[in-house]
Amino acid sequence: WNPNLHRKALLKIVENEGAKNLSNLLINNKSKITKLLRSNLEFGQNIIKTDIKRIKEDLFKLKTKTQNIFENVDLILTPTTPQLASNIEKEQPLNQANFTSLANISDLPALSLPYNCTLEKPFSIQLNAANNNDKILLKISSIFEKILQ
């Protein structure tokens, strides 16, 4: 799993599918979508079909490998983000969704819990469980929640 690479790959799929689903807004220069959304959709529209196919195959392989991990473990525990919380008034780190994207790619139930620590800025952990194993995720996360407070 390469968090940065796989997050970017997933984003390409989202932008490509968004361009297809919002094509009526994209072709209408008078539509009220933001410049940033238009730019992202245009990027997605221009991704070559063979690249999309390859990306989907790569993400499917990751999904399969991730789901196989759950044959031996109940949960995957990671930080929610690769860094501590940032100031909302400043530009956000581009990699802030690197760890959360694994749940999206692999169809995993996931949740984040704040960690009440002595660090200067907030920190949280993310728990991922096997597909359709929400019950165990909620049960174990309630234990973590008590420990982290």
PLM features: what roles do these ranges have?
Residues 65-67, 93-114:
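Small-aliphatic-rich amphipathic alpha-helix that forms the alpha element of a beta-alpha
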Residues 9-60, 67, 112-124:
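Short helix-loop capping/hinge segments that flank enzyme active sites or metal/cofactor-binding pockets
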Residues 47, 53, 57, 105-149:
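Structural helix-boundary/capping segments
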Residues 10, 54, 83-101:
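Short, surface-exposed loop/helix-turn segments at secondary-structure junctions
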Residues 80:
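Glycine-rich, N-terminal phosphate-binding loop of Rossmann-like dinucleotide-binding domains
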Residues 1:
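Acidic-enriched catalytic cores of C-N bond-cleaving enzymes acting on peptides and small amides
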